[in-house]
């Protein structure tokens, strides 16, 4: 009974990672919110409680892995996200996946610390310490990147309409999520074989740096594409105005010639 309660509490704490993940989802959508935060908060809390209870209860009572249940429950989470933001579904999915990509890196770093504190344990179940550490790392990372995500992310959300560009972002996020879940050790003791722990730290850190660099490059390429589109539109407007100006000039010249001919014929 105590073990079951412990698993329930640990999974409930692990599910709280949804809070910083949701913040990262909403920051770039700050100009696309259908409702105010005051109206969104009850929906968010309701979904959070539902996911927490279902994942924790299923993990404690059934012989299933928590991440399987959690993945299934990402569907209602995404649907709730779609309800509260007014943006293209591809943009929503790209932002949603990027948020959980960052959270998956936070989980890997929490696993490293948990493996030091409790080397006898392993995934997918965190210790209470590990769950709290994961939440702390996730909140710290969210706070650190909140400003650039809100400023530059919203710039792309508001101005970049090209679906293909957002699909590239989705593919990138899926690659990193796949990596993070592939390298997570089933038993922490595996990390203490030879230099596995060091390799785990290095490869996770390198992949996180790669994530930051790739999305930085993605931002500049997308911004350049957006600027090129605006420049092309501006040039089209200028060409249209030039055609109108030329037409008006021709009309004035023709009118002036007609008036001159009429005046000349009247004098005769």
Kindly label every feature range from the protein language model.
Residues 1-9:
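Short, strongly hydrophobic alpha-helical membrane anchors
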Residues 253-267:
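Conserved phosphoacceptor histidine of two-component systems
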Residues 15, 19-41, 53-174, 179-188:
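Juxtamembrane segments at transmembrane-helix boundaries
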Residues 169-176, 236-256:
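Cytosolic juxtamembrane regulatory segments of multi-pass membrane proteins
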Residues 196-205:
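Hydrophobic alpha-helical transmembrane segments
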Residues 10-15, 262:
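Membrane-interface micro-motifs in multi-pass membrane enzymes
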């Amino acid at each position: 009974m105590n073990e079951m309660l412990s698993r329930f509490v640990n999974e409930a704490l692990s599910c709280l990672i949804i809070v910083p993940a949701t913040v990262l989802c909403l920051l770039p959508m700050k100009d696309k919110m259908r409702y105010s935060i005051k109206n969104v908060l009850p929906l968010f809390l309701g979904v959070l409680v539902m996911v927490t209870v279902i994942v924790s209860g299923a993990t404690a009572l059934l012989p299933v892995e928590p991440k399987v249940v959690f993945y299934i429950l990402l569907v209602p989470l995404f649907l709730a996200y779609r309800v509260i933001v007014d943006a293209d579904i591809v943009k929503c999915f790209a932002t949603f996946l990027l948020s959980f990509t960052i959270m998956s890196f936070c989980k890997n770093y929490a696993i490293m610390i948990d493996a030091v504190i409790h080397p006898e344990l392993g995934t997918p179940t965190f210790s209470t310490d590990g769950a709290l550490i994961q939440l702390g790392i996730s909140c710290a990372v969210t706070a650190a990147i909140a400003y650039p995500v809100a400023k530059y992310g919203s710039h792309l959300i508001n101005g970049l309409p090209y679906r293909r560009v957002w699909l590239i972002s989705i593919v990138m996020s899926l690659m990193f999520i796949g990596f993070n879940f592939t390298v997570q050790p089933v038993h922490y003791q595996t990390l203490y074989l030879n230099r596995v722990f060091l390799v785990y730290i290095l490869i996770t850190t390198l992949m996180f740096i790669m994530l930051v660099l790739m999305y930085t490059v993605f931002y500049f390429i997308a911004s350049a594409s957006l600027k090129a589109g605006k420049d092309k539109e501006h040039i089209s407007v200028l060409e249209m105005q030039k055609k109108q100006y030329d037409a008006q000039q021709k009309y004035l010249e023709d009118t002036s010639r007609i008036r001159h001919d009429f005046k000349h014929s009247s004098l005769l």
